[in-house]
Amino acid sequence: AASKGAVSQLARWLATTLAPEVRVNSISPGGVFRNQDPAFVERYSERTPLARMATEDDIAGPVLFLASDLSRYITGHDLVVDGGFSVW
């Protein structure tokens, strides 16, 4: 949690420092499934509103969005991609 907070704050600082030439955002992913112990995956999934861990593709979409011109007016934002885990 501390490292995610540091990355988010760094992105915010860089966004103000490098604007308007460069947009800087960050992504805070939740748990990504990588063949973890089934008991861990089940416990994690029970605590997530979308009832599963992320896949790499779940993270890739937001990365592509932030890298594209579709997000041309977004800077200094930390996009949480955690299936709702953090809303509890």
Report each predicted region and the residues it spans.
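C-terminal helical subdomain
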Residues: 8, 26, 45-70, 74, ...
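Active-site segment of SDR-like NAD(P)-dependent oxidoreductases
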Residues: 14, 85
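A short hydrophobic alpha-helix cap/turn motif
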Residues: 16-20, 32, 54, 67
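A glycine/serine/threonine-rich, flexible loop-to-helix segment
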Residues: 26-48, 58, 88
